[in-house]
Amino acid sequence: MDADKIVFKVNNQVVSLKPEIIVDQYEYKYPAIKDLKKPCITLGKAPDLNKAYKSVLSGMSAAKLNPDDVCSYLAAAMQFFEGTCPEDWTSYGIVIARKGDKITPGSLVEIKRTDVEGNWALTGGMELTRDPTVPEHASLVGLLLSLYRLSKISGQNTGNYKTNIADRIEQIFETAPFVKIVEHHTLMTTHKMCANWSTIPNFRFLAGTYDMFFSRIEHLYSAIRVGTVVTAYEDCSGLVSFTGFIKQINLTAREAILYFFHKNFEEEIRRMFEPGQETAVPHSYFIHFRSLGLSGKSPYSSNAVGHVFNLIHFVGCYMGQVRSLNATVIAACAPHEMSVLGGYLGEEFFGKGTFERRFFRDEKELQEYEAAELTKTDVALADDGTVNSDDEDYFSGETRSPEAVYTRIMMNGGRLKRSHIRRYVSVSSNHQARPNSFAEFLNKTYSSDS
């Protein structure tokens, strides 16, 4: 008997077949750099910076920007942002810089140039006759890179969210050390003309390079990061959610994973912690791997680790977190089962804490406290033979060990308790639910049961 086959009849004929479906249609690519070469792009011929500034500024004023010219200018303008490397900087075996080296964003990557001249048209007419200053270059670079952030804001955000962000960004680049170079509201007008710029690989690469530089190097113009910060951990919402989750419940990654009672987590946990990736290395290329073109399909996105993502946000919903209530459910990753486990874990870590005295008036008081605690522990461990102390753990309700939580779920037949459902309904019904969000899912699924 083949365990994978099913047998049935069609027109009195016995049919035996193996029902097979595509389980994972995506080929995930890990970002680790194997050839010890810095990430690289190729651009046109390096421009005269004064000419390039005037051309790009004029294009911005007329809301007609040429992406190739913008990328060429952004790469050339990196020379204005020199800083000192605070420590030896290596990633995936590549020496980016040594402590004390003078570096610019261009030191982090390789930018090859061809002999192809840029366009450098003066679309908006000739307004600036003198050569631009460094603060003016910095302001233009900041505004251009902000187009990246604006084009990453999805249509799901309601109201004037995007306009407000654009407004705040413009205010930054009108204030010292920057200088006002365009009329207010130009940024939003320009963005509408190039709303999909986050999909242009070279523009994305340069935004990530600037962000990686300013996130480590202290610099007068570090506020340029306001437009590029979205390149950090881009397409890593699964991994980022997990990191936030373990901080929120005050456990290590290892301790948290012991509560993941479902076979579908196995593949995702293996994927998320693939050896050789610098997931926990500060200032690694890993943080910007998506923008630097090191991976086409992120193994760390919410879709790649959908069960983990769903579970974490159901726990977040139980705890009343707005971010979780607004997040989008990964419908293909067992949301009903994840909501059950999320209810139990939410109950376990919500409104409870592990507290102990850690600070004392003097050493004597500390020693007395430790001695008293030791005695308490010895008494607790002395088994009087009436109860199996392991079982006591499971039924006392005082323990939050994985074994105890698992036992409680099994005792309830893998179903949510009434108290869990009431909690889910109360947090989701008081929230204006976005389409396909966790709040909407909980409302639709459990409101009739409450």
Curated annotation (Swiss-Prot):
It comes from the Viruses. Its main location: virion. Belongs to the lyssavirus nucleocapsid protein family. This is Nucleoprotein. The gene is N. Changing residue 389 to A: Increases leader RNA encapsidation, but decreases viral transcription and replication. Homomultimerizes to form the nucleocapsid. Binds to viral genomic RNA. In nucleocapsid, binds protein P and thereby positions the polymerase on the template. Protein P acts as a chaperone on free protein N to prevent it from aggregation before encapsidating genomic RNA. GO terms for molecular function: RNA binding. Phosphorylated by host CK2. Unphosphorylated protein N seems to have a better affinity for leader viral promoter encapsidation. Phosphorylation of protein N in ribonucleocapsid may stabilize the interaction with protein P, thereby playing an important role in viral transcription/replication. Displays a superantigen activity in human and mouse, activating mostly V-beta-8 subtypes of T-cell receptor. It is found in: Virion; Host cytoplasm. Encapsidates the genome in a ratio of one protein N per nine ribonucleotides, protecting it from nucleases. If expressed without protein P it binds non-specifically RNA and therefore can bind it's own mRNA. Interaction with protein P abolishes any non-specific RNA binding, and prevents phosphorylation. The soluble N-P complex encapsidates specifically the genomic RNA, with protein N protecting the genome like a pearl necklace. The encapsidated genomic RNA is termed the nucleocapsid (NC) and serves as template for viral transcription and replication.
